[in-house]
Amino acid sequence: KLSNDKPVIKISEGKEYKINNSKNTMLLINQEMQNNKNELAAMDKVVKLALGQNAFQEIESMELSFADYKVLFIGIMAGVSDQSYEEVEKNFNTPS
């Protein structure tokens, strides 16, 4: 059975965002991750693609530490790819 339910990521109390986990978004994310040599710029682009520009701007205004931003990014990738946070974290920390 097909489901159009979108995963949600909760950043703080009252700050929840639906993750766009469509096939087209995943294709754009994969392309961005492969083509971009700047890891931070690629992470920003993924957040924009998966959560939308408004959510990205709200998150930017929070001035998260890099460690927290990485946690957010891994959570988004887990939601997009329908994997557990731990699986994505393991892959993210493994050099390619």
Language-model features, listed with the residues they occupy:
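Short, surface-exposed, charged amphipathic helix/loop patches that serve as local interaction elements
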Residues: 2-6, 12-96
